[in-house]
């Protein structure tokens, strides 16, 4: 079955926290097999996210972080001195904000691309009633049930 990466990752995370003691043996086996099938997708996704963050936090990012610290210090001084910022100071802060807005946008695009990528997973469907038993025992919300509904018959 093909699913979006984020769907597989969310399902893996939800399955990991389930208390399966009240489920039938067949349903418990299905949960275990699904964990096995979804784990590599989840681990690869987490690794990819780390790599994206590391890639984005390059030398330019470090320089901009330093500029942020300097701008914060400037804002503190301006407040202490009870004065208005100069136009040059305002431009510096606007430039920093614009750079980080573009940086965040690029990061979000990469992360969305990773999350939306389709992956093939071999999952075992199980009865919805069994899923509800596990969720009751695990004190989970229906929002979390929804993340696993695609695994049920």
Predicted regions located by residue number:
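A composition-driven surface/loop motif
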Residues: 1-153
